C-alpha cells in the first residue's frame, strides 16, 4: 500500500460512518462498491448486474407504507432484511420480493387500464385464443426480413402520429389541426371517448397511443409467416433447430389498408395507361380516391411498401419511394457496377429484327422473385453468374428465366421460336423486353434448350439445377444453387425519382427503375371500401362498386340534378357519371330501360308528384338514347337487371340488395351502405306544384308588371343577372313578377322552404290576378 493511500485511509477513518463501513462490511458487497466507486461510467454493466443479482439482497425498497406491506419472509423464503441500504436509506430486499408483490401485493384502481393498454390486452386475447400445434426439430432456414414487430390500430408516419396524439390528449394546446391530422378524425373522436376520465398520466397515454399508431420494424431472422401477429410471438415459434406451429386467435389486426391500397393503385394505372396523358390522369384519379375514409395519398405516405403500382403512384404524387428496380416479378437492388444503354437492332430466333436498348457494362445485383433470392452478375449481352437459394420450384424457375432475360444474353434472343405479340390488359402492345419476358415465362423450354448445360460445382454447399428445377450433377450454364441462406435485401433508404408522362420512374442517373409494364396483371377484391370520386375510374370496378359510386355521386349532386330535372333540361341525362353506369347495363336492354326510366320521371313531373328516392333510383338508367315500342309507348319493367347476375338488379317498386329506401327513417341503403336523405326531401314532396320549382333562385315580388315586358321563358330567366326582375306565368298560368336573388342560396332551400311563402304570396294576390 502506497503512502498516498495510507494518508487517504487515515482521512476516511476520521469520518465515523466511513469508519464503520470500512471495519464491518465485506468488500464484495455490490452496494458498497456502488456507493464508493468514483467512476460514473460502468466498465462492464452486464457483469455488474449479474454480480448484483447473485447476492441475497440486491434490491432496495423506498421508505413508506407500500414497502412495509412486504413481509420479512414468506413460506421460509426471506424477502427482505431490516438492514438499511446505504445509498437509498431503504430496506434491502431479495428478488423473491418482486415475485411476492406481483402475486400477493395489493391491487390498485385498474379502471381504464384495458382502454389505455389496449394493444397489450389484444395481444393477450390473441394468445389466449391461439391454437398451438406440434414442435418439429431439425434445421430451420431463417431469412432476415424487415418485419413489423406488433399489429397496429392504424399505421401513420411518426410526425403525423404525434399530431394525432396531441389532438387526442391535448385538444386545446394542439391548435388548429392540419389536414393530415383531420383525416383521422374518427379515430381521434373514438380515442377521446375511450380515454375520457382515466387517471393515468398523459405521458403513459402518449406512449401507448404511439405503440398503436407508429410502426416499429426490424430486420429479423424469420422462417414462415411474417405478419405482425406472428412476429410478436417469434421468440416462442422458432429457433436454430426447432419450429412451433402456431395460429393467433381473435380477429387478425393485420392492415387491410395495405391490401386495398395495392388494389386501388393497380386499377388506377390500368385505367391511366389508355389515356392520352397517363400521368395527368393517374394524378387526377389518385387525388380523388379514398380508402375507407382516408385519402389514398395519406395511405401511401403512411404505409410502408406495397408493390410496383404503389411506388408509381407515390412518385406521381411527389412522394419518395424505396430504392429498388423492377422487371416484372423480378425485384433488383444494385450491388456494384454501372450500365450504359445503347439502342441496337437485334436479330432474334424467329427471324425478326427488334430495336432494343442494350445495356453495356459489368453489373452485380441482389435479386428476388417471390421467396427465391439470389445474386446476379452480368456484362454486355451475357449472364456471367447467378447464385440462388433453394425455394418453391415456381419461384426458382421464374427467377432464373427473368434473370436470363434481364441480362439480355445472346442465347436468350436466339431462343425465341414463335411470335411475340403480347398485349397488356389495356390492349396495348408490350415493348420488346417485356414481350420476351412474357414469351419465356410461357415457353421456358425454348430458353433452357438454347441456354446449354455445364458440370455442377464440386463444393459441398453448392449444387446444380436442371430444367425441372431439381438438384442435378449438371446445371444450367452459370446458374448455381447454394445451401446457405441468402438474406432478404434491405431497402430502407428512400429516394426522390422523376416520372415520365407514360408512368416510367427514372433515377437521377437516367436509369429507368420501373414502369407501368411491371405492374402485376392480377386482380383481387379490396378488403376495405375504395371510393373513386371520378367517373373516369368507375367502369374499372365491379358492378356493385359502380352502382355505389354512381348513386353516391347522385346524392352529392342531388339538389342540382333535381332542379335541372324540374326545369325540363333533357340534356341533364348526359353526365359522365351515367356513361360509366351504362357499362353495367346489358347492351340490349339499355335503350328500353332508358325509355322506361325517362317516362316514369316525366310522369312524376307532369303529375306534380316528386318521389326523391325514385328519382335517384331511375336517373342513372336515363343515359342511353330511349328505345320505345312501335306504338311510341315505353317498355314496362318491375325489375332492372345489371351485368353479373345474382343480386345485381334493382327493383322498380320495392327495395333490393343494391338499392333500398326506408321512408320512416329517410335512410337509403346502397350495396349495404347506409346514406341519409334527411334534409333532402321536402315536406310538400307528394303535393307540390312544379311551377314553384321554376322559381329556384328567385323570389315572387308582386303582381304582373307591364313595364317589364312579356313573360320570360325558363331559358331567359336563367340569363337574368342577380337583382333583375321579370314577369313569368306561375302555376296554371298565373302572371307574377319575380326577382333573381342577389346571393346564391341552396337550390333545395328555394325549392322546398320557399314554396309555402310563394304560394301564400300568390294566393294573397288572388284578387289582383283574377
Swiss-Prot record:
<dbReference type="GO" id="GO:0044423">
    <property type="term" value="C:virion component"/>
</dbReference>
<dbReference type="InterPro" id="IPR001591">
    <property type="entry name" value="INV_PB2"/>
</dbReference>
<dbReference type="GO" id="GO:0006351">
    <property type="term" value="P:DNA-templated transcription"/>
</dbReference>
<dbReference type="InterPro" id="IPR049110">
    <property type="entry name" value="Flu_PB2_2nd"/>
</dbReference>
<dbReference type="Pfam" id="PF20952">
    <property type="entry name" value="Flu_PB2_7th"/>
</dbReference>
<dbReference type="InterPro" id="IPR049115">
    <property type="entry name" value="Flu_PB2_C"/>
</dbReference>
<keyword id="KW-0506">mRNA capping</keyword>
<keyword id="KW-1262">Eukaryotic host gene expression shutoff by virus</keyword>
<keyword id="KW-1190">Host gene expression shutoff by virus</keyword>
<dbReference type="Pfam" id="PF20951">
    <property type="entry name" value="Flu_PB2_6th"/>
</dbReference>
<dbReference type="Pfam" id="PF20947">
    <property type="entry name" value="Flu_PB2_1st"/>
</dbReference>
<dbReference type="InterPro" id="IPR037258">
    <property type="entry name" value="PDB2_C"/>
</dbReference>
<keyword id="KW-0945">Host-virus interaction</keyword>
<comment type="function">
    <text>Plays an essential role in transcription initiation and cap-stealing mechanism, in which cellular capped pre-mRNAs are used to generate primers for viral transcription. Recognizes and binds a wide range of cap structures of target pre-RNAs which are subsequently cleaved after 10-13 nucleotides by the viral protein PA. Plays a role in the initiation of the viral genome replication and modulates the activity of the ribonucleoprotein (RNP) complex.</text>
</comment>
<dbReference type="Pfam" id="PF20950">
    <property type="entry name" value="Flu_PB2_4th"/>
</dbReference>
<keyword id="KW-1157">Cap snatching</keyword>
<dbReference type="Pfam" id="PF00604">
    <property type="entry name" value="Flu_PB2_5th"/>
</dbReference>
<dbReference type="GO" id="GO:0039694">
    <property type="term" value="P:viral RNA genome replication"/>
</dbReference>
<keyword id="KW-1195">Viral transcription</keyword>
<dbReference type="InterPro" id="IPR049106">
    <property type="entry name" value="Flu_PB2_N"/>
</dbReference>
<comment type="similarity">
    <text>Belongs to the influenza viruses PB2 family.</text>
</comment>
<dbReference type="GO" id="GO:0003968">
    <property type="term" value="F:RNA-directed RNA polymerase activity"/>
</dbReference>
<keyword id="KW-0507">mRNA processing</keyword>
<dbReference type="GO" id="GO:0006370">
    <property type="term" value="P:7-methylguanosine mRNA capping"/>
</dbReference>
<keyword id="KW-0946">Virion</keyword>
<keyword id="KW-1104">Inhibition of host RNA polymerase II by virus</keyword>
<dbReference type="GO" id="GO:0039523">
    <property type="term" value="P:symbiont-mediated suppression of host mRNA transcription via inhibition of RNA polymerase II activity"/>
</dbReference>
<dbReference type="GO" id="GO:0003723">
    <property type="term" value="F:RNA binding"/>
</dbReference>
<dbReference type="GO" id="GO:0075526">
    <property type="term" value="P:cap snatching"/>
</dbReference>
<dbReference type="InterPro" id="IPR048298">
    <property type="entry name" value="Flu_PB2_CAP-bd"/>
</dbReference>
<feature type="short sequence motif" description="Nuclear localization signal">
    <location>
        <begin position="740"/>
        <end position="743"/>
    </location>
</feature>
<comment type="subunit">
    <text>Influenza RNA polymerase is composed of three subunits: PB1, PB2 and PA. Interacts (via N-terminus) with PB1 (via C-terminus). Interacts with nucleoprotein NP (via N-terminus). Interacts with host ANP32A (via C-terminus) and ANP32B; these interactions promote viral RNA synthesis.</text>
</comment>
<dbReference type="Pfam" id="PF20948">
    <property type="entry name" value="Flu_PB2_2nd"/>
</dbReference>
<dbReference type="Pfam" id="PF20949">
    <property type="entry name" value="Flu_PB2_3rd"/>
</dbReference>
<keyword id="KW-1048">Host nucleus</keyword>
<dbReference type="GO" id="GO:0039657">
    <property type="term" value="P:symbiont-mediated suppression of host gene expression"/>
</dbReference>
<dbReference type="InterPro" id="IPR049113">
    <property type="entry name" value="PB2_helical"/>
</dbReference>
<dbReference type="InterPro" id="IPR049114">
    <property type="entry name" value="Flu_PB2_6th"/>
</dbReference>
<dbReference type="GO" id="GO:0042025">
    <property type="term" value="C:host cell nucleus"/>
</dbReference>
<protein>
    <recommendedName>
        <fullName>Polymerase basic protein 2</fullName>
    </recommendedName>
</protein>
<keyword id="KW-1191">Eukaryotic host transcription shutoff by virus</keyword>
<dbReference type="InterPro" id="IPR049111">
    <property type="entry name" value="Flu_PB2_middle"/>
</dbReference>
